Amino acid sequence: SRLHTEGILTPILLGTPTEIKEAATKSGWSVNGIETIDPNNYDQMEDMVSLMVELRKGKMDEASCRAALQKSNYFGTMLVKMGKADCLLGGATYSTADTVRPALQLIKTKPGSKIVSSCFILYRQSENGTEMYAMADCAINLDPSE
């Protein structure tokens, strides 16, 4: 909410209007002016399914792609793949493996690259104010020097 208010990012929230409103109210956040997408009523779902079937050819059929797209990790990854979003944040909802797997399957790595990495930022309130820690490669590349 603060990052949106400060113009740092423009979020897209995934879920039903009721789910999003309840989560925002519970957290004390405003979702006014923030784009929301309900995967159950997404007007480009057929294009998304077709592209996902093509990307996963031989590994997932149309029915399994539709089922996967009911999960926000796959739906959000496809938004990135289709150029509708710039990135996906999902580590609070899904494990690292369940967040990275759709990206590796659908977006893939740069040609010639076999190593992926990750990072996350932790905030902690202390006597001195807010402390911020950037953690890199904690869950994916356990020994980045190799």
Residues covered by each model-derived region:
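Anion-binding alpha/beta catalytic cores of soluble intermediary-metabolism enzymes, centered on
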Residues: 1-146
